[in-house]
Amino acid sequence: TRPVFALALDYERRAQKIEILRQIRRFKNWGILRIAVCCKFDGAVKDIPADVMIAVSVPSQYAGFLPSDLSEYRGRRLHLLGGTPIQWLDLIPKLQGVGATVMSADGSSHETAAKKGTHFEAGKWRNYGKRAEYAHTVVYSGREIVRAVNAVAGSEQRSLFAA
């Protein structure tokens, strides 16, 4: 079996353009359905073919990059990488406002929070000071995150497997 989604190398310097485009072509030749590139400098998005998703490294305490002008994402399909659901809920309307479409997101903050008995509910993190079963808390938070993202996006989150 082959992967459905592939994230190419981070595009951090213009000098990487040929290498990134080769990697995209290789992924396409392998039949990978969804390809994304994380662009990490202003103006990088225009170098990426229109049929390739842009992975947005959501700024967090560890890393992240947003271009100085979000309109660079206009007309592009986006995948949010990292960050927290609260950051996503703030960022999605801004991205939609410039004409981008957020297709998907991934992060692990709900898993980290579950280790502390904290869950995501009604748009915020909650901890009632009671012991919480880890697996249930992760699943519950995941469902609540999808619900919140769909509400702010005004549509259902699309599957990576949809055509």
Task: Locate the predicted segments by residue.
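Donor nucleotide-activated moiety binding/catalytic core segment of transferases
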Residues: 51-79, 88-90
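Conserved beta-strand positions
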Residues: 8, 56, 80, 105-107
